Curated annotation (Swiss-Prot):
The active site is at 183 (proton acceptor), 190 (proton donor). Pathway: Carbohydrate degradation; pentose phosphate pathway; D-ribulose 5-phosphate from D-glucose 6-phosphate (oxidative stage): step 3/3. The gene is gnd. Gene3D superfamilies: 6-Phosphogluconate Dehydrogenase, domain 3 (1.20.5.320), N-(1-d-carboxylethyl)-l-norvaline Dehydrogenase, domain 2 (1.10.1040.10), NAD(P)-binding Rossmann-like Domain (3.40.50.720). Its EC number is 1.1.1.44. It holds the Pfam family NAD_binding_2. It comes from Treponema pallidum (strain Nichols). NADP(+) binds at residues 9-14, 32-34, 74-76, 102. This is 6-phosphogluconate dehydrogenase, decarboxylating.
Amino acid sequence: MGADIGFIGLAVMGENLVLNIERNGFSVAVFNRTTTVVDRFLAGRAHGKRITGAHSIAELVSLLARPRKIMLMVKAGSAVDAVIDQILPLLEKGDLVIDGGNSHYQDTIRRMHALEAAGIHFIGTGVSGGEEGALRGPSLMPGGSAQAWPLVSPIFCAIAAKADDGTPCCDWVGSDGAGHYVKMIHNGIEYGDMQIIAEGYWFMKHALGMSYEHMHHTFTRWNTGRLHSYLIEITAAILAHQDTDGTPLLEKILDAAGQKGTGRWTCVAALEEGSPLTLITESVMARSLSAQKQARCKAHRVFGSPVKVSKAETLSAQQREELVSALEDALYCAKIVSYAQGFELLSHTAKRRGWTLDFSRIASLWRGGCIIRSGFLSKISAAFAQQHDLENLVLAPFFAEELKRACPGWRTIVAESVRQALPVPALSAALAWFDGFTGAALPANLLQAQRDYFGAHTYERTDAPRGEFFHTNWTGTGGDTIAGTYSI
């Protein structure tokens, strides 16, 4: 009898997923382009387990039970297409190919249609949780050929992380590229979460003058409350970690952040949908700005520090604790906004593409295994379960009340950061979005007047029904013709 599933790609994530699958009672056949990697894996971590090695893709396919299921964990992009091109002639109708890499959702849509035309099922699945999650239980977000889900769901649900209530952090997301799109949104939210935490740390250090030990204890305390999450937990651990000389290691880590591109994909998707993803976009741009280390140092030599004396030196213990409490409010509010914007983008795309998505279930998939896992997600899941047509997360009764209560502290932190020249792009962008979203009137009326003035783009009037458009001859020398192809 053949192996339950085949696996191509034995980097650390691939190896760990294979071991996870085998540990949960399934047999696996594996292949890697560099075949010595297969031999090393079989002689080492896979020794004595129900894992069989192959030295060619043809051999791998021959080792599998029908219908054959092959999961790819290779670098996103052309490498995925190259492997699919090699596999396709060896497969039969009804077989299944699964892409578990960080592929762009539009590539997943293209691949699914191409393989379905040949009678082959295709699933693109988001895998979150890093190396440890792959081994112990990741969050899985599969989408693609719906008929294929029963073929792989027993394996996926077995290896996935389990939430506190025992529910697998895995479920069918939706058709064509929905799985990878949801993973992209997850990654964008991850960028946002990380940035607001970094801004909180920076405020503690520079506005409040807190020691690393004090910051460590504060984040540890926060992790027992409403900010409880994996990222808060590891931040507390990072702040306590010392270098070999006994000083905080964080002091020696260069402030130039890297990124792999999935955050940018989320921002581009938001621009394409016209969805205001301000917090996540600023979080991506903050990394880009940080990477300009040499230019920033040059600018610092030119402009110096705008604030000569830190307020931290004059704070009483009570004032410092009040600001720490306000900072907790700020991080909490911004976190709500990050998810609100992420799910709004998801909603816009789902409507355009005809995806039927269960936002409550999607939020629950992230409760365990993944990088953004937190207790907070149960509240989001409940909000969407109670109101399936919820227009925006901030309008859910629970989150609306939380924002009303915590908003004053949020404003305090953003205002104090501006006064002390501390950049908080994510916290401030989130607040600006919140004020705009909750504002019944905005200055966009002037924008429309300007557009009509120079381009005859027309405008709607407050004293006329929506959908009725007007044009004004602003200078007396124009005309009554409205804009055609020219627009801005």
